[in-house]
């Protein structure tokens, strides 16, 4: 058996997230279908992380086991022919037998682009979020700083009684480019919708809608 590692990128607009769901178009479902068409066998995909509906990815790692003793390039070129335009196979390589995408050490970085001006171009409507309220840069930077570190993020995620809500956020950075804000969140992993909730909290703090002390108390 060969262990094949794939690096994928996708436009999440038409996907209901990464994880397979019944009667939904998902990244895992489309990718698994292509792999099974190629190999002729049922295949289990293992992913380094999962994205929510509408979330895009530039470099996500997936691996699977196969009986086919092909070189990596054969998987790369043939799978590319089977995938739709909104799902790209960036690379393929033969990994060591013990490699497991989910448990391999890695960092995940989410990027949110917020337009704080009067409009978003139609060509950017799936990748840029419009937020027209005036923002105080000092407040959003302080809010970002308070979200860094190890905290209980239950208030910043979808409730799940079976999952530990403690996470360590390595960095939250905010870059301003004129009326545009680029927020980046880096951690070993995130809870369901945690990054969306943190982004919302930062923006609310920036417009003075929530107090920074209340933000800290929620952690």
Where in this protein do the model-derived segments appear?
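Structured-RNA-binding interfaces characteristic of tRNA pseudouridine synthases
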Residues: 1-219
